A protein has these predicted regions:
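Acidic, serine/threonine- and proline-rich low-complexity intrinsically disordered segments
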Residues: 1-259
């Protein structure tokens, strides 16, 4: 009798899991989320159920997707449906939030891309799309004007202090970059800054390196998003060219929340 009850329970659970797999396969992308789990690992959830976590993979943009035991214990057909759906979702989210970085990675591996540009792109991808100009100075010096144009058409901004892709400041891009770095470095995900924040007070980040990974640069005792730093530098440069004393645009200062 016990064996019969266990067999019946297994059949019932198997049917439920199969139905869940079918539902997930047909569900929109919005039912899945990427969040840090209790250990800080980048985890993929369906509702409250953890399906998988990211781990170090081939490179930053290609993490290993480690599926939970519960998925592996499903019937093979149901398990494969879940695995395929999650992989499709990861690809779709990278294309949505990190499209510029994915494009740069592809260009870095195309023979038609000039060698000096490929070298620059490879370093940019390894850095997750944001890199201090000082760290990449030699690669920049190797570019002529045409090559710089090639890089700009791919979305790169050559700032006075940082080189970055303009689309990587959006909240979704920051979340995915943070998750990919956590997987690649086998470290917990960094705590996210508030969505669309451009200025943060001292103590927000454990290090300048953490700040850079979230798109911020330390200015004095505070942190400013790298694209906003470039706007400030551009305003100062334009004022200097006109022989005027630089005064920050009040609207920009207000948006940044800068201290006096």
């Amino acid at each position: 009798d016990r064996k019969m009850l266990l067999a019946a329970a297994e059949r019932y659970l198997g049917r439920i899991m199969t139905e869940n797999a079918d539902a997930l396969a047909k569900a929109p992308d919005s039912v899945l989320t990427l969040v840090p789990d209790a250990a800080g690992q980048p985890a993929i959830l369906w509702g409250d159920s953890r399906l998988a976590v990211f781990a170090k993979g081939k490179n930053l943009l290609q993490p290993e997707i480690k599926f939970d035991r519960s998925i592996k214990d499903m019937a093979p057909e149901a398990s494969q449906k879940v695995i395929d759906r999650v992989k499709l979702w990861v690809d779709a989210m990278k294309d949505k939030h990190l499209q510029g970085l994915v494009k740069i990675d592809a260009l870095a591996n195309e023979p038609e891309t000039p060698a000096a540009v490929r070298a620059l792109f490879a370093q940019i991808v390894d850095a997750g799309g944001i890199l201090s100009r000082r760290e990449i100075d030699q690669a920049i010096r190797a570019l002529d004007n045409d090559m710089r144009g090639h890089a700009r058409r791919a979305g790169l901004v050559f700032g006075a202090l940082d080189i970055f892709h303009h689309a990587l400041m959006k909240p979704g891009a920051v979340l995915w970059r943070t998750a990919l770095f956590a997987a690649h470095d086998a470290e917990p995900m960094l705590e996210q800054a508030p969505d669309n924040a451009v200025h943060l007070k001292q103590g927000t980040f454990a290090s300048a390196g953490h700040a850079s990974r979230l798109g911020f640069r330390k200015i004095g005792d505070e942190y400013v998003r790298v694209d906003m730093v470039e706007r400030l530098i551009k305003q100062a440069h334009e004022a200097r060219q006109q022989g005027a004393i630089f005064a920050i645009d009040p609207a920009l200062a207000t948006s940044l929340g800068l201290s006096k």
